[in-house]
Structure formats: C-alpha cells, structure tokens
Amino acid sequence: MQISLQIHLSSFTFLLLIFLLPVLSESQVASSESQTLLEIQKQLQYPQVLQSWTDTTNFCHIRPSPSLRIICLHGHVTELTVTGNRTSKLSGSFHKLFTLLTQLSSLKTLSLTSLGISGSLSPKIITKLSPSLESLNLSSNFISGKIPEEIVSLKNLKSLVLRDNMFWGFVSDDLRGLSNLQELDLGGNKLGPEVPSLPSKLTTVSLKNNSFRSKIPEQIKKLNNLQSLDLSSNEFTGSIPEFLFSIPSLQILSLDQNLLSGSLPNSSCTSSKIITLDVSHNLLTGKLPSCYSSKSFSNQTVLFSFNCLSLIGTPNAKYQRPLSFCQNQASKAIAVEPIPKAKDKDSARIKLGLVILIIIGVIILAAILVLLVLIALKRRRSRSEDDPFEVNNSNNERHASDKVSVCSTTTASSKSLPDSRRVPQTMRSAVIGLPPYRVFSLEELEEATNDFDAASLFCEQLYRGCLREGIPVTVRVIKLKQKSLPQSLAQQMEVLSKLRHMHLVSVLGHSIASNQDHNQHAGHTIFIVQEYISSGSLRDFLTNCRKKEVLKWPQRMAIAIGVARGIQFLHMGVAPGIFGNNLKIENIMLDETLTVKISGYTIPLPSKVGEERPQAKKPRSNEDREKEDVYQFGVILLQIITGKVVAAGSSEMGSLKLQLENGLRDEPSVLSSLADPSVKGSYAYESLRTTVEFAINCLCEDQSKRPSIEDVVWNLQYTIQVQQGWRPSSGNHESSMKAIYE
C-alpha cells in the first residue's frame, strides 16, 4: 500500500513539473540573456531608469512603465524598450552595445531612445540582429554616419524609427526589400538629397527636417495605404503634384517649409479624407482653390501662410509675402536642383564631360581675371607717381527719426529692416530636453500627484507632481461640461500635442478619464501634463531687488522677444490659432537660463464645468482676440522697460504710458530717466527709444492701429540689432546680446 502511494506521488510530481516548466521558463529569462541585459546597463552608463538592475533581478517580472518594458517568452527577451531623458552625448564607444544587442536572438521589439547613444551603425551588426525583429526605434540619440544598406535584411521589420539623430547622406537606394514596413520615421537628420525607393505597405512616412533636394517623387502615388506623409523642413522643389491628393487613405499631408512653387492644385479639393494639409512657408503663388472657403470643408485644416498667394481682401492677406519674392526664390531653387544620379555608363560619361568642361571654363576665366588685375595694377602704379595717396571717404548715414508717430501701424518699419522681413523666423523651434509627447495612464498621474492630494494643489485645478522618471511636472485638471465624441476628443488632443515650443510651458502629454475610469469626476475629465518651471516668474524678478539686478537691458530684450515668439507660435504655429491668452507678467516664467516660458495660455478644449458664456454678448472674433494679446504684450513691455508693476487698463498704467509718450518728444535724458535704474549703462539709447515707441503702439486704444504679432517680432529684432552695434563705456554687453539674438 505504501509503495503504491509513493508511485502515485512520484507520478503526480512528474506531471506537475511538466505543466509548470513552460510557466517557469516564461517567467525567468535565460541566464545568458540576464548577463547580456546587465552588460547593456553598463554600456548605457547606468541611466536612471535602469539603476535598480542587479544580479538578482528577475527581468521578466519588471513592472512595465512608459520608460521601461521587457517582455519574455519561453525564457527569451522578445521586447526591450528603454526611454531615457539624456539631452547630451555620452562619452565612449557604443560598438560593444550594438554587439550585445545581437545576443538577444528572439527580439521582436527594440526601442532605445533618448539615451545619449553615439557612433555609427555597423553593417555587420545590422545583419546579426534578431531576424524576427519587427520594430526598431533608436530615436533622439546621437548616432551618425550613413544608414547601412544592410537594413533591408530585416525582412520582418514593420516599424523603423531613427528620427532626431545625426545620420547623413544617401539612404539605401531601395528600401523596398522591407516589404512588411508600415512606419518609417527618419525625421530630424541630414539625409538626402534624394528620396529612396519606398516599400508599398507604408502607412506613415516622416522625412521632415532633413536635406532632401529634389521634386516630390512619383513613387509616392503607389503607396495606397499611406495615411500620414510629412516632408516638411526640407528643400523639395517644383510644384505640388496632383497625385498626392488621389492617395485613397491619406489624412495628414505636411509639405511646409520647403521650396515648392506654382499653385495649390484644384484636385486638393477632391480628397475628402485629408484632415490636415500644411503648405505654409513655401513659394506658392496664384489663388487658393475656392473649395477652402466652402462650409463643406470646415472640418479640414489647411495652413498656407508665408507664401505669395493672392488673398487680397481677406484677413489672411497679411500673412503672405510679395509675389516677386517667391518668383526670385523659385528661380534660385530651380538653379540649385541636384543632377540625378547616373543610371548607366553613358550618363556617367556625360556627367564627367560636363565636369571637365566646367573646370576648363573656370581656369580660363581665372586666367582672364588675373590678366585684368595685372593691367589695373600697372595703370595704378603709373598714376601713383603723380598722386601717391588715393583716399576714398565714405560717410555713414544714420537713420533716425526726430518725430514720434504715436499709434502708427509700424515702428522701425520694414524700410529699416528689408532683409529681416524676407524670411520670417521659424515658429517651430526644437524643444531640446523634452521627453516625447505621450498619453499617460490615470494611475501614473495619481502616483505623480499623491492621488491629487490637496498638498499638491498650488493653483486652481493645477497640481504639482513628479513622474516616475524624476521629471517635475504640473497636472491641470479640466472637467468638461458634457461627454465629447471620441473623434472630436482625438482631434483636440492632436492640437494639444502640438503645444510644444521653446517659449511655452510645453505640454508633455495628457490623460482622459470618463465616469467609469474615475469616479471622482463626472463625464469626461482631461488631465494635461505640462513642464514645471521652478525659477519664478517675470513678476518675481521685477519685484525682487537682487533678481532685478540680473535683468540688464540685453536680458530684458531677450525676454521681450521670447514672449513675442511664444505668442507668435500660439497665433500662427498651430491650427487653428490660439488667441485670447492670459498674458501677464505673473504668467511669464523664466527658467535657470532666463529663457521665457509662457504659462496660463488658452487650452483649446470644449466648454468646461463652471464656464458660462453670456448669451447676450456677441462672441469676439479671432482678430479682436489677437489684438487683445498684442495689447497685453504692450503692458508687459511697459513693465520690462520701467521695472514698475502695473495692471492692464489701470490709471497707473495710463499715467506711465503718458510719461513715456512725453519722454519720446523731449530730450533723451528725460526718456532715459523713465527707464528702470537697474538697466543704467547697459543700453543704447536708440534701442530704448524704439522699444518704448513700439510698446506705445501696442497699447493703442484703436485696436486696428495696433501692430500684428509678426510686426512685434520683426521690430524687436530691429532693437536688438541696434543694441548689437552699440559698445558700452563700461562692461561688455555685446557678447551677451549676440548670444541672445542667435
């Protein structure tokens, strides 16, 4: 009986082991791969997200987070996702790191982003990566060199993301070998000049911010699954091809900041699926297709500012350049268009012959020039015997106005600055150091704010918190009056994700909770995660004697133009533009380097709980709200100049404005006495005078005479140029001014 019981127990144990072995193998990574992961930690120089790894770490049981995710199957790592927050390059070689990655032979997903990785991708390493790899993301690092042609050996790849690195030159001529590829993101490199052949299954293509210099290739029309195409910030030339608007699935088309000429095709009206079309900052001429003024296209966002379109009589006409500018630039763009690569021996010979002819021509021309110079020198010597000194006197004319035109529409106008007005400052400034925009889980935000504890609340509906990665943030809680349709919310979140700029307290991400998700909030509640700036506001600096001394005139001009560029981005850098922002010195934040960060600006969302709109009042137009923002900027500028804190529309502000107007008409010493004593000796009088004059223009009671935000930026650039040309009698502020302007 006892022997029988032992046999049964042994059988049971054996069966139990058979069932448990697969489970154990999935929960415990192979020891060799554990050592590989620890070596990867070492090669990455122990980033914060990996600091908890030790010899005893069970890698398959690490809780997934937005910055770290490891998935195991049958004892092998199938996914490794590590997201750091490094903004500078790590020292040392990373060849060993890439070699270690080849030892994870079952990887399907590999993502190493913002980790400071540098060096180049070795072709041998690429060929030895896991053959089952489906997703490769090495974005936001410092990887340089060419993208190896061997990349096409990764036949199962569905997503290839190499954006924001330092890759340069030609991409592999033919990426069609990646037959399963659906996402290709090579933005933010120096690739070019020609677009490689693309695989047919692509749904998302981003080649933005590179050095592509060709016409938009016809091969794109064969990408029938394409939903998003971003070719912005390159040097694409020629006209916008009509075939782009016949791609059946295309929803987002970004062609802005190129050298595209001609007119916008009428066929762009026939593509009802395109939600966003951005052709701004090009060389387009002619008229807009009439459909864009039709109500049937009200759900479509079309951006076309800073071209040379004929929009006479429309509010958008002021955002267009002169026709002559586009014609001149288009002819130059055609002249520098690269010669296509030779496809056979005959074309190679022709190209070589052309090069030889050009060289011979240059040599002959140089010889003629040398001969002419020798003749001229000989004649000059013969004249110098009679007149040994030849003097040329040139007088520098000073452009200064003795009369002050208060509330004129321009100050230090375009006549003073013809060059600065030709190509406006790009409004899409790179935001260095920000983590990628993402959707947060509600649990993450509860953890960051200690369950939205009252101690974390430092302003109405605004909580201070800290993400798991150690990044300090603010979380704004917005309760909507009623539930919105998912499609409507998705479109609003798309706009929200664009609110990232050097001079804004940028949005890092969001979370949406419904009644079921979070029982504290009825209906939809939106949680907006933004940067946290701890250094203080402009008001703090102007009201603190010690901090105030830091703000000399060059620093104040940098702050002024920073505020202006932030407003310009809100008005013109996103679609639709954001107007009626709560602009005051309390909301102008300054970081450790005195870089401006505007907070409290309007968040474009539906009506919020507690927000009532009077029925009797007519809604204000965007133009009215734009001019209101300019007025509020004028108030900020007034306070920057004088160092005095005044409220908009107050009697103190009116009195201060009147004193400055009188100071402009009086002796220079009178106006100088009205400036903040803290800036004494650090400014050029002409810079002070034009800044005061422009501040008064912004404060005109007649809003039609207030300048546009574009004029604000241009005129502030003029005052900075004036300051750059001034040499102080004591101390050297020129170098700081140069750094500010650049």
UniProtKB/Swiss-Prot annotation:
Membrane-spanning parts: 355-375
Compartments, record wording: Membrane
Membrane-side (Extracellular) residue stretches: 26-354
Protein kinase domain: residues covered: 426-720
Glycosylation site list: 85, 137, 209, 266, 299
EC number: 2.7.11.1
Leader sequence residues: 1-25
Primary location recorded for the protein, binned into one broad class: membrane
PANTHER family: LEUCINE-RICH REPEAT RECEPTOR-LIKE PROTEIN KINASE PXC1, OS03G0145102 PROTEIN
Name of the protein described by the UniProt record: Probable LRR receptor-like serine/threonine-protein kinase At2g02780
